[in-house]
Amino acid sequence: MEIKEKIREILVNTIEGLNGKSLKYDEQLITTGYIDSYEIIQLMEVFENEFFVKIDIEKISLSNFETIDAMSTLILEMKGESHE
């Protein structure tokens, strides 16, 4: 499963209010109120366990969790992979 699809699946299964929603990769999730700082912490834990990464504290920013695209880039960076 592609990383973006896996992130979408995690979001829909983890975040209340996203259940059953069809999310676009560039859909703004913080700006629209779907996720907040509490959910970001929740997602960090899930991502670290699911993708076997450690998210650096300095990488915790709203922009890194705003969209599925941004989350995918963050995870790939933490894995040491290119996000091209």
Where are these regions (language model features)?
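Phosphopantetheine-dependent thiolation modules in NRPS/PKS and related acyl-activating systems
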Residues: 2-44, 49-84
